[in-house]
Curated annotation (Swiss-Prot):
Protein name: Glutaredoxin-C8
Chain ranges of the Glutaredoxin domain: 31-139
Family: Belongs to the glutaredoxin family. CC-type subfamily.
Disulfide bonds: 51-54
Keyword set, alphabetical order: Cytoplasm, Disulfide bond, Electron transport, Nucleus, Redox-active center, Transport
Taxonomy of the source species: Eukaryota, Viridiplantae, Streptophyta, Embryophyta, Tracheophyta
Cellular component GO terms, alphabetical: cytoplasm; nucleus
Compartment(s): Cytoplasm; Nucleus
Domain of life of the source: Eukaryota
Tissue distribution of the protein: Weakly expressed throughout the inflorescence apical meristem and in young buds. Localized to the tapetum and middle layers.
Disruption phenotype: No visible phenotype. Defection in sporogenous cell formation in adaxial anther lobes when associated with the disruption of GRXC7/ROXY1 leading to fertility defects.
Summary of subunit composition and partner proteins: Interacts with TGA9 and TGA10 in the nucleus.
Length: 140
């Protein structure tokens, strides 16, 4: 069986550059959009639909009984701008919007927890469940 080859070495997200160019999203507007999206649910995950680490973090939360709001940046017309702003928030200075390394990015209770390594470290050291309880994502 022949599998389709994924040619996305970089995160190009949406090939419709006309949509991207007409958005005129400035960094402050993008940050406000991220804040708004992060506040819509107790747990919010910024993800890419084809990313295995993003899939793993979604499985982790769903396995814990949490229903996160998931924003697949490769499916959003303004996903590149959101990704760039998330990279800035994480303190990533290299890679730009073509580096998927910072994804997934998780917000709990409207506050950024961080990328995969921070979430997994919190899970391992036992601080993730209290965060989820405080945010109202877990009741037990």
């Amino acid at each position: 069986m022949q599998y389709k080859t994924e040619t996305r070495g970089s995160l190009s997200y949406n090939n419709n550059s006309k949509v991207m160019n007409n958005m005129n999203v400035f960094p402050s507007e993008t940050l406000a959009k991220i804040e708004s999206m992060a506040a819509e649910n107790a747990v919010v995950i910024f993800s890419v639909s084809t990313c295995c680490m993003c899939h793993a973090i979604k499985r982790l939360f769903r396995g814990m009984g949490v229903s996160p709001a998931v924003h697949e940046l490769d499916l959003l017309p303004y996903g590149v701008e959101i990704h760039r702003a998330l990279l800035r928030l994480l303190g990533c200075s290299s890679g730009g919007a073509t580096s998927p390394g910072a994804l997934p990015v998780v917000f709990i209770g409207g506050k950024m927890v961080g990328a995969m390594e921070r979430v997994m470290a919190s899970h391992i050291n036992g601080s993730l469940v209290p965060l989820l309880k405080d945010a109202g994502a877990l009741w037990l």
